[in-house]
Amino acid sequence: MNFPTIPHESNVVSINVGGRIFQTTKQTLSLAGTDSLLSQLATETTRFVDRDPDLFSVLLYILRTGNLPARSRAFDVRDLIDESRYYGIESFLIDSLSNSSQFEPFDLRRSRILQLNGRDSPSSISPTVIGGGLHVAHGSKITSFDWSLRQKSTVLTNFSAVDSLLEISPGVLAAGATDFPGLQIIDLDNGGFVRTTLNWENVTRSSSTVQAIGSSHEFLFTSFESSRRNSNSIMVYDLSSLLPVSEIDHCEIYGADIDSAIPSTKLKWIQSCNLLMVSGSHTSPSGVNGHIRFWDVRSRNMVWEIKEAQDCFSDVTVSDNLSAVFKVGVTSGEVFYADLRSLGTKDPWVCLGEEKKRNLNERRGVGSKIESYGNHVFCSSKGSGIELWSEVITGLVGNASRDVLEERVFRKNSLGKLADSGENKITGLAFGGNRMFVTRKDQQSVQVWQSPSRGISI
């Protein structure tokens, strides 16, 4: 018996863009979404688009892989933006720029300077949740740059100066100051409208100022200090409803107890351990003292505490990927690490620098900043340059498998100019997507660092 032949509809689609033929599949075009031009081309019989074929090839590659091709650096970002909007796939271009896999720390170069309006230098910076954009607090103003860093908008706040800033959802910021009560939730899409103000009611019922802000996927953390500076605490809020969940690290000052007088000025969530790292320090004529505490937010129990006295931290951060805490000593200016598995020991710190040359009579690390991103740690110690610290895997035991605790090996590389270059001291480091943002003392701008081998021309 002979069966009739059913014509097979080919899954391959040919598109003529500016005289050049491109072949792809209907599944690839459907990824663009039903409202996009590419999705419509998958169902049409005549597929001709009078646009630039070179730009189309870049966008088609992004649609297929989710990443920017190496050849994209030959194009101006404005052309790619316009073309992606024409095809209705701008969100794919944004996602490719915010992909942290495109971040190449060993090839970072200064690619752009973001100028700010007014005379105030940046006091706090916060990368956008998605897209590689940036929010900058300078004086009483907050300036926001979109993902392309070419469009900016500025809103005026109620603060005389914004000291803490964090984007908690697209277009919504949490902002606070050390001299103005309350944590304000600011809606940028409504011209800087303050949705609500979160406060901590202390024992003396005085107003409370914000010392630091942090967040996880579920919670918003805020470090408060009473205006009389005799009590401090960390409030935990639900990130979606902004309702209070719990209170941790509550301290009341009694007599000359210096430790309880130190509010936490940095909050870092450790996703792998479900712990919140809080840190704060105090400078007195006798030296610098501080604390680093690790809190289980759900049980409201403090898991570990490191008390800092000799060579206390100037700044501290934690790396989930490296399972370690890093600090830069305020006295020595050297970088130290503490393995998260050894935090129960008396002295968990291991010096990564030249420990033999440490001079505890100097304060070489004052004002130094340290942050982690991916598998790397960035430090602004000893001048205006940036140190990049990366772990060297020496074998399967300990470092690679993380099963056996042993001393780990880190290697230092230098980015930018050295201390004698004449550049101003670094005051802030932040990371988003494939970009590093740097602020410097007395400069009304933000430096953007990016890899020229991966990034498009901005």
Curated annotation (Swiss-Prot):
Leader sequence residues: none
Pfam families (UniProt xref): Beta_prop_At2g24240, BTB_2
Tree of life domain: Eukaryota
SUPFAM superfamilies, per database record: POZ domain, WD40 repeat-like
GO BP annotations listed: protein homooligomerization; protein ubiquitination
Positions of WD repeats: 259-305, 360-399, 421-458
Keywords: Repeat, Ubl conjugation pathway, WD repeat
Keyword match Disulfide bond: no
Occurrences of domain BTB (ranges): 11-72
UniProt xrefs under InterPro entries: BACURD1-3 (IPR045068), BTB/POZ_dom (IPR000210), SKP1/BTB/POZ_sf (IPR011333), T1-type_BTB (IPR003131), WD40/YVTN_repeat-like_dom_sf (IPR015943), WD40_repeat_dom_sf (IPR036322)
Pathway this chain belongs to: Protein modification; protein ubiquitination
Domain description: The BTB/POZ domain mediates the interaction with some component of ubiquitin ligase complexes.
Known role: May act as a substrate-specific adapter of an E3 ubiquitin-protein ligase complex (CUL3-RBX1-BTB) which mediates the ubiquitination and subsequent proteasomal degradation of target proteins.
Protein name per the record: BTB/POZ domain-containing protein At5g41330
